C-alpha cells in the first residue's frame, strides 16, 4: 500500500513539474497525511527512521537551495521532506544521489545537443521521482553492489 501511495504522488508531481515547472503544495498536503498514517501502521525499522528521513530530505534540499541561491525550488524541498517520511534515511540518500546523477546526465546531454539553453531551468521533479522509485525498488541491491566495489 505504501508503495502505491508514493508512486501515485510521484506520477502527479512528475506531470505537474514537466508541464508547469511547479510542484503544488496541494498535492504534497494531500499525500502527507496518507504517508504519515501508513508509517504509523506500517513503521520503518527503527521507528524513528521516517522522521529522520523527512528531516534529512527537507534539510538537505534546503541547504542546497541556500547555497545555490535559489537553484532548488521550494516544491523540490518539500517533496523530499515527504519522500523522506515515506522511505527513511537510507533510501532518501540513495534517491537523492540517483536523482542528481540522472538530472546531470540528461541535463548535460540536452545541453550538448542544444535541446535546452544554458541557464534555463529544468524541472527536477521527474528526476526525483525516477530516483525515488529506483531507490525504493532496488535500493538494497544498489547499495550492496556499490559497497562490494570498495569492501
Located regions from the model:
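Functional transmembrane core segments of multi-pass inner-membrane proteins
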Residues: 8-105, 145-151
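Interfacial loop-to-transmembrane junctions
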Residues: 109-134
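Aromatic side chains
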Residues: 20, 124-127, 138, 146
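Helix-loop junctions at the membrane-solvent interface of multi-pass transporters
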Residues: 41, 67, 112-113, 137-138
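Transmembrane helix-loop-helix
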Residues: 1-2
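Aromatic-anchored segments of alpha-helical transmembrane domains
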Residues: 36-39, 133-137
Amino acid at each position: 500500500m505504501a508503495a502505491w501511495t508514493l508512486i501515485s504522488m510521484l506520477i502527479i508531481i512528475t506531470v505537474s513539474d514537466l508541464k508547469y515547472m511547479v510542484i503544488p503544495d496541494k498535492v504534497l498536503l494531500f499525500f502527507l497525511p496518507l504517508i504519515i498514517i501508513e508509517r504509523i501502521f506500517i513503521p520503518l525499522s527503527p521507528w524513528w527512521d521516517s522522521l529522520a528521513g523527512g528531516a534529512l530530505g527537507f534539510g538537505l534540499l534546503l541547504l542546497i537551495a541556500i547555497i545555490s541561491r535559489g537553484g532548488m525550488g521550494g516544491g523540490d524541498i518539500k517533496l523530499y521532506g515527504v519522500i523522506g517520511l515515506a522511505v527513511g534515511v537510507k533510501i532518501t540518500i540513495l534517491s537523492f544521489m540517483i536523482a542528481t546523477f540522472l538530472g546531470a546526465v540528461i541535463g548535460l546531454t540536452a545541453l550538448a545537443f542544444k535541446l535546452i539553453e544554458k541557464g534555463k531551468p529544468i524541472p527536477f521533479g521527474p528526476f526525483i521521482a525516477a530516483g525515488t522509485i529506483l531507490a525504493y525498488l532496488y535500493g538494497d541491491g544498489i547499495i550492496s553492489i556499490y559497497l562490494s566495489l570498495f569492501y
